[in-house]
A protein has these predicted regions:
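Bacterial N-terminal signal peptides that target proteins for export
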Residues: 1-9
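Short, contiguous, helix-prone interaction/anchoring segments in small proteins
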Residues: 11-13
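C-terminal motif of bacterial Sec signal peptides marking the signal peptidase cleavage site
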Residues: 15-18
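Bacterial signal peptide processing site
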Residues: 20-22
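A cross-family detector of function-defining hotspots
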Residues: 24, 28-80, 98-170
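A short acidic/small-residue loop/turn micro-motif
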Residues: 88-91, 159-161
Length: 170
């Protein structure tokens, strides 16, 4: 009897930690309004940080190259969490502005690529690639192509018809 409470407290701690890793967007959104320390305690150290032009500080949590997610925690000027979201979505990608955005803009939005950067000499374009899911959890690759001046030329989403990691697990 006397051991039940510590056991249940231990189980509750494990379940809460699992929720943060299994449902990071929902967990992060519950922290909105909280300080940076709470976000760091929940998700750990960010993989990258950026000071955005509007004064927002963005923490990137990348699961690349093996995962399919990049999360952004945006903090206001007072250091309070203002938003937490998954960045590798079609909605976020379609906001990219070819001819306007630069490598810096893509990095601030999606983090630096964790897959090898490719250079296509015939196109004279550098490509950054990210793994993502499209509708119905279909594995895909998002690529951003830059000209030699570092300006975004185009973006592309290519669906992985083989099923991503599932086809390689056999």
């Amino acid at each position: 009897m006397q051991y039940r409470l510590p056991v249940w407290m231990g189980i509750a701690a494990v379940v809460l930690a699992a929720c943060a890793s299994l449902q990071p967007v929902e967990t992060g959104q519950k922290l909105i309004g909280g300080p940076q320390s709470t976000v760091r305690d929940t998700f750990g150290a960010p993989t990258e940080t950026y000071q955005l032009a509007n004064g927002t500080q963005r923490w990137i949590y990348s699961k690349q190259p093996y995962g399919f997610e990049v999360y952004a925690a945006d903090f206001d000027a007072s250091g309070k969490l203002a938003s937490f979201r998954q960045m590798l979505t079609e909605k976020e990608i379609y906001e990219a502005r070819p001819g306007v955005w630069t490598k810096r803009d893509i990095a601030e939005r999606f983090g630096m690529p964790r897959e090898p950067v490719q250079y296509y000499s015939l196109m004279k374009r550098e490509a950054w690639s990210y793994r993502m899911y499209v509708a119905g959890y279909q594995p895909a690759h998002f690529s951003a192509y830059f000209d030699d001046a570092g300006v975004l030329d185009r973006t592309m989403i290519i669906v992985d018809s083989r099923g991503g990691d599932r086809s390689r697990a056999k």
